[in-house]
Amino acid sequence: MKRYIVLTLMLLTLHAGTLLAQSAQPREKSEVEVFMQQVAKAVAKSNEIDYAYISTSMFKQLLSQFLTMVNDSIEIHDQVEQIFGSAMYMRRFISTGIEGYKVLEVAMHPFWGFLEEKEEVMGMELCALNRENGVVSIIYGNSDSVLVINNNSNALNYNIVFVAGLSYEAFMELDKSGIDLGF
């Protein structure tokens, strides 16, 4: 009897050890997970984000959604639509500096002059240009960031979203998943 108890305990220990070893293996973090870590660090540091042109309220909303998911024990994975419920509209920027703000100011010019010569803003190429029902949507992007500019034919009424740390491809996956991006 004693032998069976010892054997059972040994088997349980081996099984538990195997499970622990498998769960301890590091897995590659998705692009969205890395982005959300940056969000958490930035929000914890300050109310002002010092490395991206993006509203504090948007960061806080993203972080709130992320924490809700963790609390609900939903597994975080590559499905970006689970982290981003919607793209918020922005009219102001938290700027890293006057030079960066000037670049964005050029991009927001009411005559869209930046489209005539160089179709690039802040190192991001023009990826999509659409005009529908009087709303002009312009999307710039690269492998690191996305800039969305919406204009509803009123030079003073811009909706702008800049997302640092999320590629254009990952950002556009939101649209494919049926989520309304607001443009």
Regions found by a protein language model. Give the residues of each.
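Bacterial Sec-dependent N-terminal signal peptides
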Residues: 1-28
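Early exported N-terminus immediately downstream of N-terminal targeting peptides
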Residues: 25-99
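Short, low-complexity, Pro/Ser/Thr/Gly-rich segments in the mature regions of secreted, periplasmic
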Residues: 169-183
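Hydrophobic, Leu/Ile/Phe/Ala-enriched alpha-helical segments that form helix-helix packing faces
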Residues: 39-43, 111, 115-119, 178
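Acidic, glycine-rich flexible loop segments
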Residues: 120-145
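Long, charged/polar, surface-exposed segments that mediate recognition or autoinhibition
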Residues: 84-129
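Polar/charged side chains located within well-ordered beta-strands of beta-rich proteins
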Residues: 8, 15, 91-92, 148-150, ...
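A short, solvent-exposed beta-edge/loop patch
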Residues: 137-171
